[in-house]
């Protein structure tokens, strides 16, 4: 049984579909329950229908990950429905891509609530259930923006320099860098237990609904298929927990290292 947050669209939805194709029962979590209810295409109802149509079991859980009250009911609701929990994927995220000097306190608060507090609290709630199974997996979805930009003198032709300067990813990247450190800490503190904790990010941009809506990214840059993230997530959440833990990794290099090819979301 897996919980996947931010699963009404994009990377989260595709991870849920890939897990279901391998036989996992999935609880999918997001704010948008019905089609047309959110600002972007995609909803829990649509993803659940796709999973069920392929023979999978799915529980949609409508919740706002920025709300501590909503966060507190996600794990209990999934466990009550399925009777167990094996995997937690913390994918939901938020940011405002504005010049950092224009970012408001409310932007910082919401970004840290979604991108750091939610993974921390859900992991705390999930851990007793993972321990009860004797093995478990926690996967935090990070971002290449967590990488610190190099110092001056700045290379005007450097892709990452240009993205950070013009894409205003400082707030988002700061929360994801904190998430990477949190991941490494969870992993080492659980190193004597059979619970793997890893962070996974795409190499570059993924053309998800959210990324397209944000805009400002160059289609000539490396665009990674969402299937690569879904396949890499599967590898980090089904291999023996003591085999892969404490990794802060990018999807395509991980798959190359493990000598695993990218499959479709249906597992084919």
At which residue positions do the language-model features occur?
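The beta1-alpha1 cofactor-binding region of Rossmann-like NAD(H)/NADP(H)-dependent oxidoreductases
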Residues: 42, 62-74, 105
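A short, exposed helix-loop element centered on a Lys and neighboring polar residues
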Residues: 123-124, 184
């Amino acid at each position: 049984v897996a919980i996947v947050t931010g699963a009404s669209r994009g990377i989260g939805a595709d991870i849920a579909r890939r897990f279901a194709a391998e036989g996992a029962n999935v609880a999918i979590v997001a704010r948008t329950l019905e089609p047309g209810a959110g600002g972007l295409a995609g909803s829990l109802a649509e993803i659940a229908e796709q999973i069920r149509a392929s023979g999978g079991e799915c529980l949609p859980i409508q919740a706002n990950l920025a709300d501590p009250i909503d966060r507190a009911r996600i794990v209990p609701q999934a466990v009550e429905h399925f009777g167990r929990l094996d995997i937690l994927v913390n994918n939901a995220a938020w940011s405002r891509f504005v010049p950092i000097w224009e970012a408001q306190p409310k932007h910082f608060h919401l970004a840290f609530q979604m991108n750091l507090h939610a993974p921390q609290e859900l992991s705390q709630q999930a851990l007793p259930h993972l321990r009860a199974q004797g093995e478990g997996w926690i996967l935090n979805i990070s971002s290449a923006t967590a990488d610190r930009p190099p110092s001056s003198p700045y290379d005007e032709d450097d892709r990452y320099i240009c993205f950070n300067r013009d894409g205003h990813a400082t707030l988002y990247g700061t929360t994801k860098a904190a998430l990477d450190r949190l991941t490494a800490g969870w992993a080492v503190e659980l190193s004597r237990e059979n619970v793997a904790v890893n962070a996974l990010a795409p190499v570059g941009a993924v053309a998800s609904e959210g990324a397209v809506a944000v805009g400002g990214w160059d289609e000539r840059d490396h665009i990674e298929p969402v299937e690569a993230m879904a396949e890499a997530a599967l590898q980090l959440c089904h291999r023996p927990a003591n085999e892969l833990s404490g990794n802060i990794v990018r999807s395509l290099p991980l798959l190359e290292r493990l000598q695993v090819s990218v499959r479709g979301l249906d597992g084919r």
